[in-house]
Amino acid sequence: MSATELPTKEAHILKGHEGAVLAARFNGDGNYALTCGKDRTIRLWNPHRGILIKTYKSHGREVRDVHVTSDNAKFCSCGGDRQVYYWDVSTGRVIRKFRGHDGEVNAVKFNDSSSVVVSAGFDRSLRVWDCRSHSVEPVQIIDTFLDTVMSVVLTKTEIIGGSVDGTVRTFDMRIGREMSDNLGQPVNCISISNDGNCVLAGCLDSTLRLLDRTTGELLQVYKGHISKSFKTDCCLTNSDAHVIGGSEDGLVFFWDLVDAKVLSKFRAHDLVVTSVSYHPKEDCMLTSSVDGTIRVWKK
Amino acid sequence: MGSDEEDFVFHGTPIEREEEIASRKKKAVAGASGNLRTLPAWKQEVTDEEGRRRFHGAFTGGYSAGYYNTVGSKEGWAPQSFTSSRQNRAGARKQSISDFLDEDEKADMEGKSLSASSQFDTFGFTAAEHSRKHAEKEQHERPSAIPGPVPDELVAPVSESIGVKLLLKMGWRRGHSIKEVRASSDARREARKAFLAFYTDENTKETPDSLVSETEVETSLGEDIKISESTPVYVLNPKQDLHGLGYDPFKHAPEFREKKRSRMSANKEVGFRKPLSMKESLFGPKSGKIAPGFGIGALEELDVEDEDVYAGYDFDQTYVIEDEQPARQSNDNRLRLTSKEHDVLPGFGAAKNSDYSMERFNPPIIPKDFVARHKFSGPLEAETKPTVSAPPEVPPPADNNLKLLIEGFATFVSRCGKLYEDLSREKNQSNQLFDFLREGNGHDYYARRLWEEQQKRKDQSKLTLDVKVSPTVQKMTAETRGSLLGEKPLQRSLKETDTSASSGGSFQFPTNLSDTFTKSASSQEAADAVKPFKDDPAKQERFEQFLKEKYKGGLRTTDSNRVNSMSESARAQERLDFEAAAEAIEKGKAYKEVRRATEQPLDFLAGGLQFTSGGTEQIKDTGVVDMKSSKTYPKREEFQWRPSPLLCKRFDLPDPFMGKLPPAPRARNKMDSLVFLPDTVKAASARQVSESQVPKKETSIEEPEVEVEVENVERPVDLYKAIFSDDSEDDEDQPMNGKIQEGQEKKNEAAATTLNRLIAGDFLESLGKELGFEVPMEEEIKSRSKPEDSSDKRLDRPGLKEKVEEKTSSLTLGSEEEKSRKKREKSPGKRSGGNDLSSSESSGDERRRKRYNKKDRHRNDSESDSSSDYHSRDKQGSRSRSKRRESSREKRSSHKKHSKHRRTKKSSSSRYSSDEEQKESRREKKRRRD
C-alpha cells in the first residue's frame, strides 16, 4: 500500500475535555468513541460528525482507560481512584464498583463475551472481576509481575499483560501455564494483531517490538519515534499491514509491518500523543493528546 | 326620730359588742382578698388586724410595711409541724418531789449523799444503789403498758452469796484457805477441852498431859504427809546458801552438815520466840500465843478462836524438827545416787528424750601414695628434645642382617615413640640380636639412625603442607588448564606461535584499536584472521566466504590486508565481496521465520569452528545492537499457572486443574529477580560446548509441554464428557458427510456447533449454581436433590430465554437468514426441553432425553455434523491442533470482517441520535424474534 491510502487527513477536532485526554477508544462497530482524561470525566462522541453525545461523571480522580462491551450496552473505566467502574451507557449510571487494587489502575479490558473485566494496576497485579454475579471480590489475582502492569489484552483463551519490568506475560487458561517473554526494556503498551498471532509491544527505549506469540521470537523492530518518559500508545491497522505509534513530540508514525520502514509521519498534535486508536473496519483513526483535544483522521 | 337624737347628748365611747367585732373581722378578710385579686395596686389600702384602715407605716417607721397584705403572721411564712395528742391522753404520771424541785435544788440533794467507790464496796451497797438508779432511768426512758414502779426496783442484786455466809458461820474468814481452816478448827476444839480441864483441875495427874501430847504428834505427822504429797520437793527444801549448783561443801565431812542443821533449828527457835514476845506485849494476857499456820490478815482483829493454848511448850516444836530431818536425808541420798549413776550434777536429773543428735564428719583419709609436691613431666620432656644434638655419623656394622634390623627398628621407634624401645628392651634382654639397645654392637649406628628417622618425620610434616599447596599452583598454569579443557587450545597455541613469529607488527595494532578486549581474546582473533590467508590463495571461492564472515569484524580485515601483500586484482575482488556481504546483512534485518530456518543449516554445514568463531565475534561487537538484542532478548520462560475455576467457566473453558488441590502460592520476592542476574551472566559467558547443548535442552523442554497439553485436555468434567460422547456417537453414524461438504458450509457449521455448545454449557452451569454446586461431580448428589429439581427447573425456563438473548446479541455471525432459520429449528428443541424439565424424573432418563434432543438437533442441522468432525479430529494430536488453531483463527478473522461490513451498512442507514438508535435497534430485534 502507498502512503496516500493511510488516514493522514484531519476530519474533525473533538473539543470538550478540560485537561489532558489519556485514552480514546472506538466501540466494537466503530460508530462511536469514548474518551477519558484528567478532568475525571468520560465523554461519548460521534467522531464522524464531531458531536459530543454524553458525559459520565463519577470518578474522583483522573480516568486512565475505558473499554466498551461488544453489545455496546455497557462500558468499564479505571483511573487514579483505585477502582474499576462498570457503567450503563444509556442511563449513565454506575452499575457496580470493583475495589481491591492497592494502587492506580492503568488499563481495563472486557473479554469477548463481556462476562469478565480484567484490570492492570500499579500494585503489580492483574485482577479479574465478574460482571454476571453481584460479587465484588476479584475472581482471580495474578501477581507474578515484578513491577507496574501498564497494559492488558485478552483473547478467547489467554490473558496477556505488559509490565514495566520488561516482560510480556501470557496466562493460558486452557493449559494452565504462564509464558514470560523478557524484552529487557520497560513495556509501555501492548497490542495484539487481528489474526492473534503477534503481539506489538511499545517499549520506553523509543522502540516498538513485534513478537511471535507461539514461539516468543522477535519478528521486527520499529524505530523513529520518541517514547522515553510518557505513556504513548501503539496499534495495528485493521488489515494488519501497518503499525501505528504515537510520539512524545506530537507526531504520529506509520511503519510497514514487514519492512519496518517509516511510510509517513505527520504532526497530529502540539504535545504528547497519549492514545492512538484505529477503526475496526474503515480507514479511520483517533488520536488524543495532552493538549485536551481528540482528532479524527481519514484518507 | 330626728327630734329624739337632737334631745339626747352622748358622752364617752360606746361599748363594742362581740357581733360587731366579728363582722368587722370578716369584712376585713373579705376586703383583703378582694383587694389583692381584683383591685389594682394603686387602689389597695392598708388595714389593721381588726379591719380598720390605717396609714401605711408612716408613723411606725415602716416596721410593718411588709407584714399586712402579704403574710398571715408576724413570724413569717414558715408553717408549723403538726403533732397529734392521742398518745399523750392515756399517760397518767405520778408526781414526785423531783417534779416540783428546781434544777438547783436537785443538785443540792445529790451533793449531800455520800457513797463508796467500787474498789471499796465490800458490802455491795453502792452497787445496789447504782442498780436502783439505772432501773429508774430505764423506767423513765421507755414507756410501759402497766403503770407503776418496775419490779426491778424491788429486786436488788446482792454482793454476798449464801455459801459465803455459811462458811463465815462455820469459822471461815476471808483470806484463809478452806482446808487449813478445817484442820485447825478440829485441833482448836480439842485444845479448848484440854484447856478447860487443865484450868479446872490444876493439881490432877500427869497422864492426861502425855495423852494429849501423843494425839498432837499424830496430827502433826498426818499434816506433814499430806503436805509432802501435794507440794514438790524443792518447795519444801529451798536453796538457802550461796554456793553454785551441785556444789556440796560437806561432801567429805557429814559431821559438819549435822552441825549446820542444828544451827538452823536453833535459828528457827529464836524466830518463834520473838513474835511470841511481841504479841504478849501488844495484846496482853488474854491473847496469849498464836497457833502455827498461815498468818491472819493485818487488818483483821484477833478472835478468841485464834488463840493457842500450848504456845509456850518447846517440847512439841522439837518433835516436829526431828520428824523433818529424815525426809531431807532421804532426798539427799536420792540425789547422790542419781549423780553417781548418770554423772549429772546433783539436784538435776538426766532428760528422758534427747532430740539433738549431732552428725560427725570425719576428716578425709590421706592415701599412702600421696606426694605433696606436684611434678610436671610434660615440659621437661619437651625441653629435652631440642637440646639433643645430632649424633656423629657412624659406619654401618659388618652384618647386613643386623643393619637391616637396626634400620627397621629405628623407623618403628620414631613412629610409636620411646616406650616401644623400652618395652622391647625389657622383653629382649636375653636375645643377643637386640644388644644394640643395651650399648652393645651397633649401638652408635642405631642412635644415628634413630636421629635420622626423626628428622625425616619432621620433614614429612612440612612436605605434606607443601603437597597441599602444589595442586592449586598446578591449576593456575596454562598447560594444565589447556589439558583439562581439551585438545583445541593446544592447536591454537601451535598456530599462535607461528603467527606471532610471522606477523609481529599486526599483533600490536589490534590491541591498540580494541582496548576493551583481553589479550587472550585478541590473540585468538588474530589467529582466526590469519587462518584463511594460508589456505585461500589456492581456492578463491573459500576466500570469499571467509571474507564475508570477517566483514563483521570490520577493522581487523583491513589490518590483515595491509600486513599481507596482495595483488590489486585480489583487493578489487575483496571489495566486491564486502558489498555483497553488506547487502546480505541488510536483508537479514527483515528476515522472518522461514529465512532463519534456511540460514541455520548453512551454519551447521560450514563447520563447528566457523560457527563458534562467528558467535564469539558477534557477542564482542558493540556496534550491532539489534542483533545483540535479538539473541539475548526476548527471553522466554514458562511457569505453571493455575486459573480459578470460575474464570475458566466465564471463558467457557474446562479447568485444567480439575480435581487437584490448589498449590501453595509461590513467593516471588526481589531476591528472585537478583537470582536471575547471574544466570544471564553465565549464559553470556557460555562457550562453544554450552552453545551446542542449548538446542538439545530446548527440544527436551518442548516435549513435556506436549505431554502437559494432552493430559490437561483429557481431564474434562463429567458434564462435558456427556457432550463429547454425543459428538463421538454422531461421528460414528455419519463419518462420510464431513468430507463431502464444501468450505462455505463448514464455516456455518462451526458457528452452529459453537452456539449449541455455549447453550448447553450455560444451561449446565445454571443448574450447578442453583443446586448449590459449582460443578456437580456425582450422580448421588443429583438423586438426593430430587425434590429441589422441580422448583429449580421452573426457574430455569426464564434463565434459558435470557441466555439466548445475550448470546444472539454477542454473536457476530453472518447472514440474517441463517439466524432466522436456526431460531425456527431450535424452537421445537426448546419446547421439548421445557416439557422434560417440568416432569420430575430420574437423572438418567433426563440425560438420555438430552442426548436424543441433541441428536435431533444435529440431524436437523446437517451442517453441524461436519463441524463436530473438526472438533473430534482436533483430539488426535497436538501438532495438528496448532495448525488448525491458526486456520480457525483465520476463519474467525474473515467472519469478523464480513460482520463489520454489514454493521457499517446498518449504521449508515440510521440518522437519529445514539439513544434513539439504540431504541430502534431493540425494537427491530424484537420484531425479528417475533
Curated annotation (Swiss-Prot), chain B:
Knockout-associated phenotype: Developmental defects, elongation defects of all organs, reduced plant height, triple cotyledons phenotype, reduced vascularization and infertility due to failure to produce pollen.
Keywords: Growth regulation, Isopeptide bond, mRNA processing, Nucleus, RNA-binding, RNA-mediated gene silencing, Ubl conjugation
GO terms for biological process, alphabetical: miRNA processing; mRNA processing; phloem or xylem histogenesis; RNA processing; siRNA processing
Bias (Polar residues): 499-508
Family matches, as PANTHER family: G PATCH DOMAIN-CONTAINING PROTEIN 1 (PTHR13384:SF19)
Function comment: Functions as a component of microRNA (miRNA) and small interfering RNA (siRNA) biogenesis. May assist DCL1 and DCL4 to efficiently process and/or recruit the precursors of miRNAs and siRNAs. In the miRNA biogenesis pathway, associates with the DCL1 complex that processes primary miRNAs (pri-miRNAs) into miRNAs. Binds pri-miRNAs and precursor miRNAs (pre-miRNAs). Is required for the interaction between pri-miRNAs and DRB1. Required for general proper plant growth and, in particular, initiation of vascular development.
UniProt-recorded name of the protein: G patch domain-containing protein TGH
Organism whose genome encodes this protein: Arabidopsis thaliana
Gene giving rise to this polypeptide: TGH
